[in-house]
């Protein structure tokens, strides 16, 4: 996991087995940005949701294939508006970090500051329209 802010992290694919550890570490919500069947062996959204709920985590599925749409960014913004410690994940964390950045910028955040925060976490958003 890579910190995008004090309460938001981006991550590559999370395993259902890892979610109880995240809950124990203080995470309260998981946002799954992977479409089902993106690659062989990937857990389905239903499997991740069941594990998240069993661990006491709030779960949101906002599948993103490619560049996040404004509607997907808005859904991510809604998932983050209550400042619950949240891990967003996709295959590499890139789509999740892009959706996070688009969500913040749509709500008035400075694009350069958001890009800098993503870069500090290891995500290059220089080509993402914010």
Where are these regions (language model features)?
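Short cysteine clusters
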Residues: 90
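Cys-dependent protein tyrosine phosphatase-like superfamily
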Residues: 1-87, 98-130
